[in-house]
C-alpha cells in the first residue's frame, strides 16, 4: 500500500511537469495544429499550446485558452483537445470548425 501511494505521488508531479513542459514546447507543436485549423497565427500557437496537448493536459491547456480567449473555452479538450472542440479557437479569430 505504501508503495502504491509513493507511485501515485510520483505520477502526480510528473503530470504537472509534463503540463508545464507542454505549455512551453507545445507552442511549436501547435504550429501544425493551428495551421490545420486555419492558421490562427502566433496567438493561436500560444493559445493552443495546451489545447493541442488535450491528451490529459487539457486542464492546463483549458485554463490557458480560457484565459486568453476570455473564458469562452468551456470545451477544453472536449473532442479534439487540440482546439478545444473547435470552440475555444474561435476566440482568437481562428475557428477550428472541426
UniProtKB/Swiss-Prot annotation:
InterPro entries in alphabetical order: HssA/B-like_chaperone, HssA/B-related
Entries under Pfam families matching the protein: Coiled
GO biological process: sorocarp development
Superkingdom assignment: Eukaryota
Spans annotated as Disordered: 1-29
Family: Belongs to the hssA/B family.
Name this polypeptide is given: HssA/B-like protein 36
